[in-house]
Curated annotation (Swiss-Prot):
The keyword Protein transport belongs to this UniProt entry's keyword annotation: no
Pfam (any one): Ribosomal_L11
Family: Belongs to the universal ribosomal protein uL11 family.
Superkingdom of origin organism: Bacteria
Protein's name according to its UniProt entry: Large ribosomal subunit protein uL11
Lineage: Bacteria, Bacillati, Bacillota, Clostridia, Thermoanaerobacterales
InterPro entries, alphabetized: Ribosomal_uL11, Ribosomal_uL11_bac-typ, Ribosomal_uL11_C, Ribosomal_uL11_C_sf, Ribosomal_uL11_N, Ribosomal_uL11_N_sf
Record-linked SUPFAM superfamilies: Ribosomal L11/L12e N-terminal domain, Ribosomal protein L11, C-terminal domain
Gene Ontology terms for molecular function: large ribosomal subunit rRNA binding; structural constituent of ribosome
GO biological process: translation
Keywords: Methylation, Ribonucleoprotein, Ribosomal protein, RNA-binding, rRNA-binding
Amino acid sequence: MAKKVVAVVKIQLPAGKATPAPPVGTALGPHGVNIMAFCKEFNERTAKDAGLIIPVVITIYSDRSFSFITKTPPASVLLKKAAGIESGSPQPNKQKVGKITKQQLREIAEIKMRDLNTTDIEAAMRMIAGTARSMGIEIV
């Protein structure tokens, strides 16, 4: 028989740097999950992605066990890394803060494909291009 799901928690954490401090402690503590076990397992799984923010969906069961799925980093994080900028533009249509090439856009779309609701690379590129436009990043 399958275990009963008590809660599903979604949080974004820096890869390889989860600690029992907030936000992990405050998200998992009320459900009685072993926070150190989660942190250790998350850090092992995401060590190769150091420096990126990783969204994680944690499923908590009635026996206080858990399972989790890591997603791909948000498109905005990947775009900022590719453009070499700290943050997006406060006025995206007026003030451009960075540039990326079509090739970089394609690479980001390929990384994000498994989390996007499309199987077409061109459609994924258009979605990522929209995010870039709203951040003030120009595609050349």
